[in-house]
C-alpha cells in the first residue's frame, strides 16, 4: 500500500539509486535518445538545431520510452500516467529548456519525473515533484497545460542535477573543423579526418555513425583497411572500449573510452631523459606526442 505522499519521492529516489547509483544508466538514456532522433547514420545530423519542429517535439516521447525500457527493473507502465514506480503513478516530462515542462491537467494530484538534457553542454537533470496547483503557474496554454512556477521549482527533489552524459564530440568541435570533416566525399576519409582532428576526446558511436554514414560503421575504425591502419603512419592510435585500450588511456592520463566510444591520440617514443606518463607496447615506451614532435609511425595496439 502506498505510504504518505511525501515519502513517495524518497521512494523514487531510493529506487533509482539502488539500480543506478552513479547515474550512468540515465546518462546513457539521454545520449541514446539524442542519437536516435538525429539518426545520424542516415541523415548526417548531429544537432537539435537541425531537426524539424515535429521531430524536436518527439524527443520527449523518445526519452520517456527509453527510460521505461532501460529501467524495466523498477518502472512499470502506469494506468493513468506514463509510469508506475513503487505503486505510484508518475508522469514523465522532458523539456529541452531547463524549466519548460508542460504539465497536463490530468497529472494534478500525481507525481512527475522531470527531465532536461542539453546536448551542447552534455549535462542532464532528473528530479521528482508532486503536481498540485501550488507548484504550477496559473492559467495554461491552449490545451490546458501549465508550467512549474518559479516558486514551485524549489519543491523539485533532484535525483541528478547537471550531471554529465556521454558528450556529443561533434558539437564541441570548431565550426571550421566540422565543415572540413563533413565536406570530404567518402565515409572513410571523413572518419580519418575526425580522428585526426578530435584527438584526446571521447567519440561516441553515434558520432562515428554520423560521420561514416555507412552500415557496420564501427568496422570502419579497425586495422585491416580502417582508420586505425590509415592513421598509423601519422603516429595516431585509436583506442576503443577494450580493457587493454582503457589501460593505455589510463596510463597516458587520457579520458577513458566508455562503452562504444573511441579516442584517438598521437604517440611518440619516450626519450631517455624524459620523465612523463608512458605506456609500453612491444617493448617500446610511448608517450603522448607534442606538437613539436616529428611524426613517427605508431605501434599496433594490442586488444588483450
Locate predicted features.
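Extended, Lys/Arg-enriched charged tracts that mediate electrostatic binding to polyanionic substrates
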Residues: 83-84, 88-93
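Nucleic-acid endonuclease domains
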Residues: 1-81, 94-304
